Amino acid sequence: MKLENLNIIIADDHPLFRNALRQALSLSFANTTWFEADSGDALQQVLDKPTVGFDLVLLDLQMPGSHGYSTLIHLRTHYPELPVVVISAHEDINTISRAIHYGGSGFIPKSASMDTLKDALTAVLFGDIWLPNGTEIIPIEDDATDQMASKLSDLTPQQYKVLQMFAEGLLNKQIAYDLGVSEATIKAHATAIFRKLGVRNRTQAVIALQQLEMDKLDLT
């Protein structure tokens, strides 16, 4: 595999960071096309491009709409061949271990040098798992969170998008307008979401989603 002519997504809500990352990596990965997303919803819109085959996602766990590890879980379920590298300002062993536990192909601290970043992405693009030097992954034993992660993975991309919009506090009518579908369609999605998550209403569904957020896992 030649590391050129790649399609790489940078999903982070800080435009200065995205720009710096893109400029630095462009020197190492020739003729790469860079796609950017500043939220979980924007990331899904990029992934929905039917004519683009993506090679890598660089994912910030805390951008708006990401809900911690839930977007990572969603990506691993619906895009299993697409490597996802987590880039985070949180560098503690619990954060790193959960990122790998939920399917990340690597973890890069935002404090890493550009040389380290280049080496990490090269390793992942060649099929390896990359971790900071000296990192020893700890086992994650959290049955309740793992069960919710499994339930979230059952949601279709559209259902996951609707659940994210529930978390933003949008009404069914607003969601229907934004997605260009009928309100009845949103109600049908809601019913399916509640069933798959084992909850009874929107509030419980949002609480379920929040179980995968970093601060709910005492990782801040």
Q: Language-model features: where?
A:
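Recognition helix of helix-turn-helix DNA-binding domains
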Residues: 169-204
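The feature encodes the CheY-like receiver
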Residues: 64
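Acidic catalytic/metal-coordinating carboxylates
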Residues: 39, 67-70
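Short, flexible helix-to-coil linker/hinge segments that flank and couple to helix-turn-helix
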Residues: 97-100, 109-152, 161, 214
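Active-site beta3 strand of CheY-like receiver
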Residues: 52-58
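Active-site residues of response regulator receiver
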Residues: 60-61, 88
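Short amphipathic alpha-helix used as the core "switch/output" element in two-component signaling
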Residues: 69-81
